[in-house]
């Protein structure tokens, strides 16, 4: 179920969490190309105040754990307005151009602080 909330005036931190499933996760050429593209995004994007990039952790199997994704990328923005700017930023668009052909699925979870 999708919950839509009016967050236009949100001023607190905005967390943008992105999960990627690569088409060929065992193909070294593909994983290297994806990692190169996302690392370029991390290095060059001016909007994020913090970043985290990694692979699915190999943890014990539990019903609540989904580690089927190939890569995870999280960016923290100062607010919603900054995240909106990121969506049209040339660094983000270049990443999509360079890497979109490598993934078969992407899921984004965005969150805002309830304390704002």
Question: What do the predicted segments below correspond to?
Answer:
Residues 39-42, 91-97, 103:
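A common structural junction motif
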């Amino acid at each position: 179920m999708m919950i839509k909330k009016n967050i236009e005036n949100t001023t607190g931190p905005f967390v943008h969490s992105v999960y990627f499933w690569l088409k060929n996760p065992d193909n070294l050429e593909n994983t290297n190309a994806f990692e190169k593209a996302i690392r370029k995004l991390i290095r060059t994007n001016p909007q994020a105040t913090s970043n985290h990039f990694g692979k699915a952790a190999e943890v014990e199997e539990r019903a609540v754990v989904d580690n089927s994704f190939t890569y995870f990328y999280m960016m923290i923005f100062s607010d919603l307005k900054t995240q909106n700017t990121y969506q049209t930023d040339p660094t983000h668009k270049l990443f999509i151009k360079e890497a979109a052909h490598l993934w078969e699925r992407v899921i984004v979870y965005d969150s805002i602080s309830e304390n704002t």
